[in-house]
């Protein structure tokens, strides 16, 4: 594993490369730096978009605006969960249905049921054995665990946030529909994916397939959110 030191990356020379796109018949220039035999392309574009995302998330946190993280990759589950919990935001995974984004009233009833069952099994369980059959208690418990597993990251959500961070989604349909519903979308995206780019409000240019790249970007975003939250203390 290569340790990336930002000071070293800043101080090494800048190179300008070129490539010919035969399909589109055009000549493309690109900027890159070479560090430990690794090439970093379009470094200024990456920093430009990352700094904009930092500022936006700082302002969100400063004014106590909630953020919802949507994740479609199992390998990023712990990253998303940690980032949401450390910054008092919400998260959910794509392998569960996310229809609630378009039908909040119906989904809110599920959150009410989740809170009710949690209180039931947290505070009143010892009293329930005197009044409810054992089989019914077990059935209710399985319902509770199932809802908690799916929506535990949304348990304390009072209203649906307008700012949504999407991680590892390649569905243009999702981006387009969220955009039509006036959600503000933040996402790590490949700069060459023009269909997705046009539906993202705050773009973070990067490799959204690499766990290490996502983790590096998340550390910066975590700093931005914590930085903004300090304003109110």
Curated annotation (Swiss-Prot):
Indicate the transmembrane segments per the record.
Answer: none
Q: Which Gene3D superfamilies match?
A: Glucose-6-phosphate isomerase like protein, domain 1, Helix hairpin bin
Cite the entry's keywords alphabetically.
Apicoplast, Plastid, Ribonucleoprotein, Ribosomal protein
- MF terms in GO: structural constituent of ribosome
Q: Name one Pfam family in it.
A: Ribosomal_S2
Gene Ontology BP annotations: translation
Give Gene Ontology CC terms.
apicoplast; small ribosomal subunit
Q: Sorted alphabetically, which InterPro entries does this protein's record hold?
A: Ribosomal_uS2, Ribosomal_uS2_bac/mit/plastid, Ribosomal_uS2_flav_dom_sf
The entry's localization annotation reads: Plastid, Apicoplast
SUPFAM superfamilies, per this entry? Answer: Ribosomal protein S2
Q: Name the protein family.
A: Belongs to the universal ribosomal protein uS2 family.
Record protein name field: Small ribosomal subunit protein uS2c
Say which species the protein is native to. Toxoplasma gondii
């Amino acid at each position: 594993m290569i340790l990336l030191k930002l000071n070293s990356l800043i101080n090494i020379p800048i190179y300008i490369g070129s490539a010919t796109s035969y399909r589109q018949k055009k000549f493309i220039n690109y900027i890159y730096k070479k560090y430990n035999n690794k090439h970093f392309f379009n470094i200024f574009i990456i920093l430009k978009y990352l700094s904009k995302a930092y500022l936006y998330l700082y302002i969100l946190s400063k004014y106590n605006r909630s953020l919802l993280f949507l994740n479609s990759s199992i390998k990023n589950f712990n990253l998303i969960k940690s980032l949401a919990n450390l910054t008092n935001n919400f998260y959910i995974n794509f392998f569960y249905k996310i229809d609630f984004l378009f039908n909040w009233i119906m989904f809110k009833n599920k959150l009410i049921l989740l809170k009710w069952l949690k209180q039931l099994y947290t505070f009143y369980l010892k009293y329930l054995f005197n009044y409810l059959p054992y089989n019914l208690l077990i059935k209710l418990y399985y319902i509770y665990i199932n809802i908690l597993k799916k929506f535990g990251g949304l348990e304390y959500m009072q209203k649906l946030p307008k700012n949504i961070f999407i991680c590892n989604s390649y569905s243009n349909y999702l981006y387009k529909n969220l955009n039509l519903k006036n959600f503000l979308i933040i996402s790590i995206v490949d700069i060459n994916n023009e269909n997705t780019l046009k539906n993202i409000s705050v773009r973070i240019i990067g490799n959204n397939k690499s766990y290490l790249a996502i983790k590096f970007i998340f550390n910066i975003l975590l700093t931005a959110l914590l930085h903004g939250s300090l304003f109110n203390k």
